[in-house]
Amino acid sequence: MAMAAAAVIVPLGILFFISGLVVNLLQAVCYVLIRPLSKNTYRKINRVVAETLWLELVWIVDWWAGVKIQVFADDETFNRMGKEHALVVCNHRSDIDWLVGWILAQRSGCLGSALAVMKKSSKFLPVIGWSMWFSEYLFLERNWAKDESTLKSGLQRLNDFPRPFWLALFVEGTRFTEAKLKAAQEYAATSQLPVPRNVLIPRTKGFVSAVSNMRSFVPAIYDMTVAIPKTSPPPTMLRLFKGQPSVVHVHIKCHSMKDLPESEDEIAQWCRDQFVAKDALLDKHIAADTFPGQKEQNIDRPIKSLAVVVSWACLLTLGAMKFLHWSNLFSSLKGIALSALGLGIITLCMQILIRSSQSERSTPAKVAPAKPKDKHQSGSSSQTEVEEKQK
């Protein structure tokens, strides 16, 4: 990490990780003492506690980096957001798609009840992953034999969730890269499937499970399409922490859950059809550098995230001053060494967070030959998933 970047990132890291540990501690106490007595009371409290941490990342996007998120949606869809449970299905275009979702959830008043289906390793990320675990995010191993029951039970637990929630599901299964697109195109060409140009072939098992298990209490599916204008550099966590702006376009279309077909095969085909339509929509975006013919909705950046960050900064600064005055930490070599160690740990944690978000570090998808597939085989790749559904 370059010295100039470190000079900016480390202070932000100190604020984020120390406040995050406080939040994690509060979440743990509530989990142990309150959740056994009342799960919904725990959820209501955790929603407020978790939001005080997640708003710091919203502040980084909105105020520190000045990322501009432009939302395109019809009035009916936009007015429903935040007032109902929803399954959110999105293409995985950038390194911060999950943060874009948080921004939209925050604008809609449901940031504290935003959920997602994520890979299991994410829950071990310092502070942020722990807060997600306490908030009932669903973590999968990318092995359907193990994940099927985990996903089903996790989805069914949301039946009595006390506030409107969004559950995000990235059905492509991995972030978009040119290498993965090429693999998907080669597979589609050999399997007589529509050849994608801007998206990957969706994995439909998780989507089918989500629809089957939640259609009785989740009324809507928000189909989100993320695109980066040609005039804007792609947003990354490193760019955010360095205060470098970007522009992100998001198109949102609401589908009523009751309008989806009943059978699993038809639900899977519906999902694939939506990604074919999403691919065509992205073609139009590439040509026009916007979503043509779509209404742009106003989502001004709110003051709440700024107020939270200022409050955390004041509290931690005051606490640090009192601690240093009491401990005389810098009056000995041991104290200086401990301080240096703490800074080193925070720097390492920031690097882990940044590196975990980088799409190019993901393993490129492998092209599987078109052949019949054992129904009991794991659906861990988009190509083999399509094979099973196309039998």
From Swiss-Prot:
Membrane topology qualifier: Multi-pass membrane protein
Main location: endoplasmic reticulum
One Pfam family from the record: Acyltransf_C
Example of a GO cellular component annotation carried by this entry: endoplasmic reticulum membrane
InterPro entries membership: Acyltransf_C (IPR032098), Plipid/glycerol_acylTrfase (IPR002123)
The enzyme's E.C. designation: 2.3.1.51
Keyword set, alphabetical order: Acyltransferase, Endoplasmic reticulum, Lipid biosynthesis, Lipid metabolism, Membrane, Phospholipid biosynthesis, Phospholipid metabolism, Transferase, Transmembrane, Transmembrane helix
Subcellular location: Endoplasmic reticulum membrane
Enzymatic reactions: a 1-acyl-sn-glycero-3-phosphate + an acyl-CoA = a 1,2-diacyl-sn-glycero-3-phosphate + CoA
Residue ranges of the motif HXXXXD motif: 92-97
Family of this protein: Belongs to the 1-acyl-sn-glycerol-3-phosphate acyltransferase family.
PANTHER family: 1-ACYLGLYCEROL-3-PHOSPHATE ACYLTRANSFERASE-RELATED, 1-ACYLGLYCEROL-3-PHOSPHATE O-ACYLTRANSFERASE 3, ISOFORM E-RELATED
Function noted in UniProt: Converts lysophosphatidic acid (LPA) into phosphatidic acid by incorporating acyl moiety at the 2 position.
Protein name: 1-acyl-sn-glycerol-3-phosphate acyltransferase 2
Species for this entry: Brassica oleracea (Wild cabbage)
